[in-house]
Amino acid sequence: MGSIGMTELLLIFGIIVLLFGAKKLPEIGRGLGEGIRSFKSAISGEEKKEDEKVVTPKEIEAEVIKKEKVKENA
């Protein structure tokens, strides 16, 4: 109970064909695929942003001081 069997899937597919027609099915599938693809890329984009290192102001200040000391010694 609760799982969808092969007969239920065929029935759902038949209803979709009746509602939209056979000519519209490739367009619907293409649109659905593009939507899923863009959703996945948006999610992976957020993960990439989280992986990037966050630089704090203290780290920036320390780097500037380090460069100034190098200039003074040169």
From Swiss-Prot:
InterPro entries (alphabetical): TatA/B/E, TatA/E
Q: Which Gene3D superfamilies match?
A: 1.20.5.3310
GO BP terms in the entry: protein transport by the Tat complex
Q: Which Gene Ontology CC terms are recorded?
A: TAT protein transport complex
Pfam (any one): TatA_B_E
**TM helices/strands, residue ranges:** 1-21
**What's in the keyword line of the UniProt record?**
Cell inner membrane, Cell membrane, Membrane, Protein transport, Translocation, Transmembrane, Transmembrane helix, Transport
| UniProt subunit comment | Forms a complex with TatC.
Q: Which family does it belong to?
A: Belongs to the TatA/E family.
Listed name of the protein: Sec-independent protein translocase protein TatA
Organism equals Sulfurihydrogenibium sp. (strain YO3AOP1)
- List the lineage, top down: Bacteria, Pseudomonadati, Aquificota, Aquificia, Aquificales
Query: What's the gene?
Result: tatA
